């Protein structure tokens, strides 16, 4: 007879450390849930355009709930066209499909496109109403250091996110909406022949051959240069966030270095299979003096490539095991 066991495992080895000049950073191996690096991970900071991911997440959610359609055409308000910076160059005479708006945000980082979606999804038809909705939804997703004042990351003293929250958000987009996530890897998007010089995706990792397929850059003078990135190599996916970098070129170099470090310094290994017995525990008043402790699921761990450290299995028995026993 065995008990199924969810145990605590401690890896004693070390990988080569990664030094980043970013003000804040977070690197996650999505496949195993292993956090590879944290720097000021919970500090609320200006997220710039990276916070557009929350607008996108909610739009994807509304589409899947049947509350919004990709082919639905939305009007463009005066409030939307007043935004400058990165835009789709929308006019108030336009009626734009939701699908074009999504690509306008993902590829072109359109501030105006965010507002069009926000006003359509807001409970009261305003961008502020949608921003409040974003904040409440973020809290339900476990993003405890995020407050939204607008839909596009336009500088505002109250508009903040932590890099950990951005990683949570990116992870949810990848996991929850694979059918829309592929848009993030698109290199170009041109809306109605407007601003042909502004059609390329700003993600510096796309096309480098390192598996990068998302997500979103951001920049303001206060926030510096940032990127929420993701890359898939084989069956492993890495998600990372950096912010507060000093230039566009530094951001590109830092992001590429992170991807290379995460994949080259760590590998996924299997240390046990479901129902494998990894230890024993004493039993009171039983026919047998001990019972086997088995894994409830496969044990796949992320470990440093060049480390031969050992895995320590620690099983914590919180209550005495008394006979009679049943499996499970």
Please provide the spans of the model-predicted regions:
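Glycine-centered loop/turn positions within well-structured domains
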Residues: 1, 34, 112, 298-299
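Active-site-adjacent loops and short helices of periplasmic peptidoglycan-processing enzymes
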Residues: 13-178
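Bacterial N-terminal signal peptides
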Residues: 1-10
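Domain-terminus/edge residues, biased toward the C-terminal soluble/receptor-binding domains
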Residues: 144-147, 155-328
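Generic marker of residues within folded, mature protein domains
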Residues: 7, 15, 37, 64-66, ...
């Amino acid at each position: 007879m065995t008990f199924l066991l969810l145990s605590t495992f401690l890896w004693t080895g070390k990988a080569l450390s990664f030094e980043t000049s970013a003000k804040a950073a977070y690197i996650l191996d999505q496949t195993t849930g292993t956090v590879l690096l944290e720097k000021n991970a919970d500090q609320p900071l200006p997220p710039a355009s990276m916070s557009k991911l929350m607008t996108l997440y909610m739009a994807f959610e509304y589409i899947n709930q049947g509350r919004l359609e990709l082919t639905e055409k939305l009007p463009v308000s005066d409030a939307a066209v007043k935004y400058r910076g990165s835009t789709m160059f929308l006019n108030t005479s336009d009626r734009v499909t939701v699908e074009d708006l999504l690509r306008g945000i993902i590829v072109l980082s359109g501030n105006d496109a965010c507002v069009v979606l926000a006003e359509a999804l807001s409970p009261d038809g305003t961008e502020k109403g949608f921003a409040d909705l974003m904040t409440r939804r973020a809290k339900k997703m476990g993003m405890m250091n995020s407050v939204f004042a607008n839909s596009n990351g336009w500088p505002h003293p109250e508009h903040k996110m932590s890099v950990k929250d951005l990683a949570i958000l990116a992870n949810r987009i990848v996991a929850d909406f694979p059918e829309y996530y592929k848009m993030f890897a698109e290199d170009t998007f041109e809306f109605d022949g407007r601003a042909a010089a502004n059609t390329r995706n700003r993600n510096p990792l796309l096309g480098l051959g390192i598996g990068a397929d998302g997500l979103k850059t951001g920049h303001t003078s206060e926030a510096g240069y940032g990127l929420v990135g993701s890359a898939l190599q084989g069956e492993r996916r890495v998600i990372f966030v950096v912010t507060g970098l000093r230039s566009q070129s530094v951001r590109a170099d830092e992001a590429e270095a992170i991807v290379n470090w995460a994949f080259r310094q760590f590998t996924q290994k299997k240390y046990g299979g479901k129902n494998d017995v990894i230890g024993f525990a004493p039993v009171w008043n039983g026919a047998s003096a001990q019972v086997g402790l088995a894994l409830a699921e496969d044990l796949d761990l992320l470990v440093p490539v060049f480390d031969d450290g050992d895995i320590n299995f620690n099983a914590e028995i919180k209550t005495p095991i008394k006979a009679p026993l049943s499996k499970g």
